[in-house]
Amino acid sequence: MIALIQRVSRASVVVDNQTLGSIDKGLLVLLGVEREDNREKMEKLATKVMSYRVFSDENGKMNLNLEQVGGSLLVVSQFTLAADTGRGLRPSFSGAGTPDQALTLYEEFVAFCRDKGVTTETGQFGADMQVSLVNDGPVTFNLQV
């Protein structure tokens, strides 16, 4: 399971000209599911995302996590993160999770974060989305479990 996280001052996702999710300070999470992923991996990754210290403390050091800064999550499904780009000029998605598996784990990821008290907004699974963000830093990390 893969989470590409970006520290943002604001982010939103639009589908069919309607804003589905919007946050101010927090993390934009592009979430990719691979074939071997399961609930255990999802919980480990969600915990890591929520606990990852990517926000600056009073000394300017990345030392604070999402909860410590009162931040939110915007979680957007992104199967292209599971692409194999090692050969040729066209990505292979053979390692990506099935649509049913990915939808289940995406929904469980969102529910897990909400159950932990984190304000969590979403896009629409499988939709053509327009994602807007102001990347604070920029700060971007690729987390995998």
Swiss-Prot record:
Where is the protein localized? Answer: Cytoplasm
Which stretches are transmembrane?
Answer: none
The kind of enzyme this is, by top-level EC class, is hydrolase
Give the InterPro entries listed for this entry: Daa-tRNA_deacyls_DTD, DTD-like_sf
Looking up Pfam families in the UniProt record yields: Tyr_Deacylase (PF02580)
What does this gene product do? An aminoacyl-tRNA editing enzyme that deacylates mischarged D-aminoacyl-tRNAs. Also deacylates mischarged glycyl-tRNA(Ala), protecting cells against glycine mischarging by AlaRS. Acts via tRNA-based rather than protein-based catalysis; rejects L-amino acids rather than detecting D-amino acids in the active site. By recycling D-aminoacyl-tRNA to D-amino acids and free tRNA molecules, this enzyme counteracts the toxicity associated with the formation of D-aminoacyl-tRNA entities in vivo and helps enforce protein L-homochirality.
PANTHER family linked: D-AMINOACYL-TRNA DEACYLASE 1, D-TYROSYL-TRNA TYR DEACYLASE
About its domains, the entry says:
A Gly-cisPro motif from one monomer fits into the active site of the other monomer to allow specific chiral rejection of L-amino acids.
Its name, as the record gives it, is D-aminoacyl-tRNA deacylase
Organism listed in the record: Shewanella sp. (strain W3-18-1)
